[in-house]
Swiss-Prot record:
Family: Belongs to the herpesviridae U10 family.
Record gene name: U10
Name of the protein in its database record: Protein U10
The organism's place on the tree of life at top rank: Viruses
A Pfam cross-reference name: DUF570
Organism: Human herpesvirus 6B (strain Z29) (HHV-6 variant B)
Length: 503
């Protein structure tokens, strides 16, 4: 009998061993750790050239307005100043005009791991604000020199826009921090007993626990401002005895899915926000909160929330993944995505490449057309990894600034709208989070809307584009190797050979 083994690149996809004999195949499932295998640019070259042909034949005449060059798709797009022609609003700063525009780019539907960083080349005067997208119709802010004002007031101008192939890492397994060293005096100050519910911890098996919570007192937590009253996240705290004093010092938490409730046909969800122990491990404390990535019914008050609740959680003493992602609180209160259920082996066709951030309250863009969302959640991971923030395909109503979420800091998301009258209801998707190689050494953020892709393709503004995630570096490497004489290209002492094939 012949045994053939196919090993997949997925973290959660198992190794499948096919036993072929007598015309039948038997698959055996074997779990293993995540491996981030970087596919070269040539792996996607056929797909990228197909995108270009479709764009030429479906949207524009084949007049060389799009081409594939040095690992990037270059599109000569017609840029219209919608801020002037439609909205009648522009911003004039330092000999440049900032406005709003829409462009149509080649649209990518598959594979799920491939995206594009859309940006303007370094030698372009008309600069589109960088974004990460699958392509198609996108809108955002752009800028141009004052001397082009007359051209834009009449029609528009052609400008080159680059689409850089981008493949983020798969997210590793993620956990929440289990605070285990707080002083009892500090605990009594932050969690007065008369304001806390009582929790009884029941051990189910190993480190899987049930928490029976009684006498909860809910309070309003203000999370934002706007033209109307800010949205209210409702929270409650609890305290009780911890049954297992032999728990190791360095542990993490795995929270289960949000608990759903119904009130007058409206659904809402609650989950644990934080959980911790005092230093001697005799007392446990924590908070519950309504989920801020879903719409909360307006009739929901502190009086009609449950006073009794049963929660389930797992204390993780051995981290399975060699590269864990640790959040300061429960990420299921703020984000959505298959990444948050990665430990479930029965997910069908999951996507582990991005997390979605939703509006935690009703977002108003009046009067500045700009809004900054700050979420009280931090993350911790390996020193060579970071999380990159970009937009969500939103039909042109607003844009999300490409920037880094620095480890150990609250999440800041900068939003801009074409209109001061736009209101984004709570739970609207506002940003996408990607797990990438480290892009800066100072944890600086990319906020400049005139950031360009450098001529050598290594930077976008002040952010480094790591080779591990941005595939155009393969083409740059090929060009540099092609310039080496054949005699000197033979590997030898002091010579490094490259395994990158031409795209």
């Amino acid at each position: 009998m012949e045994i053939v083994t196919y090993k997949t690149a997925s973290a959660r996809s198992p190794t499948v061993t096919w036993s072929s004999g007598f015309g039948r195949a038997i698959a055996s499932i074997q779990k293993r750790h995540q491996e981030n295998i970087r596919k070269p640019l040539r792996f996607y070259s056929g797909l990228l050239h197909c995108l270009i042909k479709q764009y030429e034949h479906c949207l524009v005449p084949p007049n060389k307005s799009i081409r594939f060059d040095k690992g990037k798709i270059e599109v000569a797009a017609l840029i219209l100043d919608l801020g002037h022609q439609v909205l009648g609003r522009q911003i004039h700063v330092r000999q440049r005009i900032y406005s709003w525009t829409s462009i149509t780019l080649p649209k990518l539907f598959t594979p799920r791991e491939l995206y594009f960083l859309v940006a303007s080349p370094e030698d372009e005067d008309i600069v589109f604000n960088p974004t990460i997208t699958k392509g198609g119709w996108i809108s955002g802010s752009f800028s141009y020199p004052v001397e082009y004002r007359s051209n834009f007031s009449l029609t528009g101008m052609s400008a080159n826009v680059l689409m850089v192939p981008f493949v983020p890492y798969r997210y590793p397994l993620n956990y929440a921090r289990f605070i285990s060293s707080i002083d009892l005096m500090i605990l009594n100050e932050q969690f007065p007993e008369h304001e806390c519910g009582d929790i009884q911890i029941l051990k189910q098996r190993n480190y899987l626990y049930l928490g029976v919570i009684k006498n909860l007192t809910w309070k309003k937590s203000v999370t934002g401002t706007g033209q109307t009253a800010p949205h209210r996240i409702l929270k409650a705290s609890f305290i009780g005895s911890w049954p297992d004093t032999s728990l190791p010092d360095r542990v993490a938490l795995r929270f289960f899915n949000n608990t759903r409730f119904t009130i007058h046909c409206h659904e809402f969800a609650i989950n644990i926000e934080n959980l911790g122990l005092v230093k001697n491990k005799e007392k446990v404390f924590g908070t519950l909160a309504t989920v801020c990535c879903e719409q909360i019914p307006s009739l929901l008050t502190t009086e009609n929330l449950p006073r009794y609740l049963i929660v389930q959680f797992e204390v993780v003493t051995q981290i399975e993944d060699p590269e864990p992602l640790l959040f300061s609180s429960n990420p299921k209160l703020y984000f959505t995505g298959d990444v948050l259920n990665a430990t479930m082996q029965l997910q069908h066709n999951p996507n582990y490449y991005d997390l979605l951030v939703h509006a935690p309250y009703d977002i108003h863009f009046y009067p500045s057309r700009c809004h900054i969302v700050i979420l009280p959640i931090r993350y911790f991971t390996r020193g060579d990894k970071q999380i990159l923030i970009s937009g969500y395909q939103n039909e042109g109503f607003f844009e999300t600034q490409v920037m880094l979420w620095a480890p150990g800091t609250p999440l800041h998301i900068t939003l801009r709208s074409f209109s001061p009258n736009l209101i984004l209801p709570q739970s609207t998707p506002i940003a996408t989070l990607f797990y990438v190689e480290r892009m800066t050494s100072q944890n600086t953020e990319q906020k400049d809307v005139i950031a360009k892709l450098s001529e050598n393709g290594h930077f976008i503004g002040n952010l480094k584009l790591p080779r591990e995630n941005f595939l155009h570096h393969d083409a740059i490497t090929d060009l540099s190797l092609a310039a080496i004489p054949k005699d000197s290209a033979t590997p030898g002492p002091g010579t490094v050979s490259s395994s990158v094939s031409p795209s």
